[in-house]
């Protein structure tokens, strides 16, 4: 029996991080966690990491699609924060972002790691951006690194 699992070191990988500016005080912490993990765990060089900033979470899938279509990257990490408010806007934004990023991955055969927080409060978002619930940006980077190595097994 053959078991394929991806390691975390991917020093030659080209990684794109697409990040929303909306809720930037949280997203910048996610970005710091992702970059730290890519460099320290994945051994990815600065020159192999590209950061693309977009206005909000709704724009993440479109830009991720363009990044994927460029064929220059081995994985994409999407980072953002969507916080529930008093209107149904949260469901629309979170749902379309999730669906769109998943579609990019399937359409372009590239790992798209979902590091978009969807929380009920600012406090929950802060907890997931490097305080008591860990850093979801770092976790998204770990997923991207592992998937780069898994996908390489099928080339």
Swiss-Prot record:
Q: Which GO terms describe its cellular component?
A: cytosol; riboflavin synthase complex
A GO MF annotation of the entry reads: 6,7-dimethyl-8-ribityllumazine synthase activity
| Its EC number(s) | 2.5.1.78
Could you say which residues bind (2S)-2-hydroxy-3-oxobutyl phosphate here? Answer: 86-87, 128
The entry's keywords: Riboflavin biosynthesis, Transferase
Q: Which reaction does it catalyse?
A: (2S)-2-hydroxy-3-oxobutyl phosphate + 5-amino-6-(D-ribitylamino)uracil = 6,7-dimethyl-8-(1-D-ribityl)lumazine + phosphate + 2 H2O + H(+)
An example of a Gene Ontology BP annotation on this entry?
Answer: riboflavin biosynthetic process
Q: Which Pfam family is one of this chain's hits?
A: DMRL_synthase
Q: Which InterPro entries match?
A: LS, LS/RS, LS/RS_sf
On assembly, the entry states: Forms an icosahedral capsid composed of 60 subunits, arranged as a dodecamer of pentamers.
Per the entry, what this protein does is: Catalyzes the formation of 6,7-dimethyl-8-ribityllumazine by condensation of 5-amino-6-(D-ribitylamino)uracil with 3,4-dihydroxy-2-butanone 4-phosphate. This is the penultimate step in the biosynthesis of riboflavin.
| Name the UniProt record assigns to this protein | 6,7-dimethyl-8-ribityllumazine synthase
Q: Quick one: which gene encodes this?
A: ribH
């Amino acid at each position: 029996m053959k078991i394929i699992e991806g390691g975390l070191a991917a020093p030659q990988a080209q990684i794109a991080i697409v990040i929303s500016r909306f809720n930037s005080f949280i997203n910048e912490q996610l970005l710091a966690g992702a970059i730290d993990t890519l460099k320290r765990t994945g051994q990815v060089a600065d020159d192999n990491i590209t950061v693309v900033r977009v206005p909000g979470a709704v724009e993440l899938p479109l830009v991720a699609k363009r990044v994927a279509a460029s064929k220059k990257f081995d994985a994409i990490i999407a980072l953002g924060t969507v916080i529930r408010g008093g209107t149904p806007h949260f469901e629309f934004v979170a749902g379309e972002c999730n669906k769109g990023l998943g579609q990019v991955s399937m359409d372009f055969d590239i790992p798209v790691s979902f590091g978009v927080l969807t929380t009920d409060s600012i406090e929950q978002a802060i907890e997931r951006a490097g305080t008591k619930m860990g850093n979801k940006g770092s976790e998204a980077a770990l997923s991207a690194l592992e998937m780069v190595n898994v996908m390489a097994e099928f080339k």
